[in-house]
Amino acid sequence: GGVLASLCDVALAGAVSSSMEKNQWCLTAQLDVEYINPAFPGEIFAFGKLVKRGSNLAFVEGGIESKDKKLIARAHGIWIIKNFTVNK
C-alpha cells in the first residue's frame, strides 16, 4: 500500500505543478487513497488531474491503473501552493 500511495502522491503533485509558476512550490496537505484491486507484477500507470486551483490550495484526483485499464487505486487530495523568493 505504501508504494502505491507514493505513486499517487507523485502523480497528483505532477498535476498541481503543471499549473504553477516558476517561483512556486507545492506540498501535500492531505492525500486519501482507496485500494480497489491488487497490483500484480507488470506495468502500472499513475495519473493525476487538477480539479480546482486557488491561489494557495489545489484540489486533485487521480489513481493507478493496470496496463489493461483496471483501476488499482483511486486517490484525491489537497496541495498547498507557496511562493518563494531567492535571497542573494
Residue ranges, per PLM feature:
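HotDog/MaoC-like acyl-thioester-processing domains
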Residues: 38-47, 51-88
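Hydrophobic beta-strand-centered segment that forms part of the acyl-chain substrate-binding groove
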Residues: 13-45, 50
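Hot-dog-fold acyl-thioester-processing enzymes
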Residues: 1-13
